[in-house]
Amino acid sequence: MSSPRFTPGQAVGNRLKARGETFEDMRVGKKVLLTWTEKWAEELSGTLGATPAPRTMFIDTFWLRTVDTPEGGITVAFAPIGAPGTIMLMEDLIACGAESFVGVGASGGLDPNHPVGDVLIPNAVKILDEGTSVHYPDQGDPTGDQEMIKTLSVLIEKHGGRTASGDWWTTDGFYREMTDDIALHMENGILGIDIETSAMYRVAQYRGVTVCNILVVSDELWIEWNYGIDFSEFKTGVTAMQQAAVEWAQS
């Protein structure tokens, strides 16, 4: 049977060695809040009191901050956009002891009932238009952890957000979200779209860790493109999403 030439643990170990560090220098919490927006990563870190920790990646663009807790610590990870870089970092963190992930990000909305500012939670990814997840064993539809979905749904609403969970679409083609595809997937009940979730959910299933993404709607795709990152509703949704993520991490 064929196997990978090298493992995430070997890769991280060699990067650490090149910096004169070892795994004992790492500070990766059991719980990880992973986000692709540096401002949000800084805000989450500030709320949690997380401090800089040694990075796993060779470059210093993408960073980690960790706060120690009796339950095993919480790490905030500023991650590369897109499935390949996100999965590289996620695999690194799992090799360093991470056990549970919440992706804190943004999404495109396909459901008119959930406009800009609503926080969507992907359940099962039905449309896989990205290329990273195919490199991992197929265990059916990549699916989020059901207990985490329930918990985070309650927390988002507790903090004043509107939320929904449902079937999902993940793509590599950020600028190729075609109108015919959007119409078809809307007919089939797809709730939203992003560029990382399917790979994150599949890796979690393969590695035996838990993950749930919470993704505020930044743009509406169902008729004309409506980009809403300057809307007050978007800012309200971001606040509720972050507060829910922090409360989950501290629980």
What is each of the regions a protein language model found here?
Residues T151-H159, V203, A244-S251:
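Generic non-transmembrane alpha-helical segments
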Residues M1-T151:
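Metabolite-binding pocket within alpha/beta catalytic cores that recognizes anionic/polar moieties
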Residues L221-S251:
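His/Asp/Glu-rich mid-to-C-terminal helical/loop segments that flank catalytic regions of hydrolases
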Residues E99-S100, L191, T210:
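Short acidic/polar active-site loop segments enriched in Thr and Asp
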Residues T37, G108, W169-F174, A199, ...:
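Glycine-rich beta-alpha junction loops
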Residues Q139-N188:
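Active-site rim beta-loop-alpha module in soluble metabolic enzymes
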Residues S198-E233:
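Zn-dependent metallopeptidase/amidohydrolase metal-coordination segment
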